């Protein structure tokens, strides 16, 4: 049985904010902000990583139905490569909070730092396992990103994106070596950058030989 967090901890107009996808080698980083309704309990809220896929899917719909407000946002691969993953994540969190249809009086951010927001905010380390609103945000972000990676698996077959969701598993690294990076791979991440540099060297060597 998967026990959820105590819904009595929910406070009015407090947004929970979380992200999914900082570690993968490809795809966007996805964030969500959720303001829960203390009068509409949701059973079983917990850190998305502690829930089964089926339970996350069910909660995804229930959260969107019962929340006072919610927003799913993102930072694209190009933004990650340009800004770095930390700043891109902060940008995506800003977008999630700014996209809420109701302005929160406080935003609780999973982790140890907060993005610049127009509302008061506070970081909560391991917040997705403590704060129901952050847990709800983690579920929205994870389900949304997982669905996208499953769709991208059809666009870029052979990489196993539907399974590992872009994380640097042995099978993903092997596919990267065999097939090379796709347009959705993060060029600023070391394994992808190393592969691009290797390809560049392999292309340049014959040219230098011809010039001798």
Curated annotation (Swiss-Prot):
<dbReference type="InterPro" id="IPR001352">
    <property type="entry name" value="RNase_HII/HIII"/>
</dbReference>
<dbReference type="GO" id="GO:0004523">
    <property type="term" value="F:RNA-DNA hybrid ribonuclease activity"/>
</dbReference>
<protein>
    <recommendedName>
        <fullName>Ribonuclease HII</fullName>
        <ecNumber>3.1.26.4</ecNumber>
    </recommendedName>
</protein>
<keyword id="KW-0540">Nuclease</keyword>
<dbReference type="InterPro" id="IPR024567">
    <property type="entry name" value="RNase_HII/HIII_dom"/>
</dbReference>
<dbReference type="GO" id="GO:0005737">
    <property type="term" value="C:cytoplasm"/>
</dbReference>
<keyword id="KW-0963">Cytoplasm</keyword>
<feature type="binding site">
    <location>
        <position position="19"/>
    </location>
    <ligand>
        <name>a divalent metal cation</name>
    </ligand>
</feature>
<keyword id="KW-0464">Manganese</keyword>
<comment type="similarity">
    <text>Belongs to the RNase HII family.</text>
</comment>
<dbReference type="GO" id="GO:0030145">
    <property type="term" value="F:manganese ion binding"/>
</dbReference>
<comment type="function">
    <text>Endonuclease that specifically degrades the RNA of RNA-DNA hybrids.</text>
</comment>
<dbReference type="GO" id="GO:0006298">
    <property type="term" value="P:mismatch repair"/>
</dbReference>
<dbReference type="InterPro" id="IPR036397">
    <property type="entry name" value="RNaseH_sf"/>
</dbReference>
<keyword id="KW-0378">Hydrolase</keyword>
<feature type="binding site">
    <location>
        <position position="18"/>
    </location>
    <ligand>
        <name>a divalent metal cation</name>
    </ligand>
</feature>
<dbReference type="InterPro" id="IPR022898">
    <property type="entry name" value="RNase_HII"/>
</dbReference>
<feature type="binding site">
    <location>
        <position position="110"/>
    </location>
    <ligand>
        <name>a divalent metal cation</name>
    </ligand>
</feature>
<feature type="domain" description="RNase H type-2">
    <location>
        <begin position="12"/>
        <end position="201"/>
    </location>
</feature>
<dbReference type="GO" id="GO:0032299">
    <property type="term" value="C:ribonuclease H2 complex"/>
</dbReference>
<dbReference type="InterPro" id="IPR012337">
    <property type="entry name" value="RNaseH-like_sf"/>
</dbReference>
<dbReference type="GO" id="GO:0003723">
    <property type="term" value="F:RNA binding"/>
</dbReference>
<dbReference type="GO" id="GO:0043137">
    <property type="term" value="P:DNA replication, removal of RNA primer"/>
</dbReference>
<keyword id="KW-0479">Metal-binding</keyword>
<dbReference type="Pfam" id="PF01351">
    <property type="entry name" value="RNase_HII"/>
</dbReference>
<keyword id="KW-0255">Endonuclease</keyword>
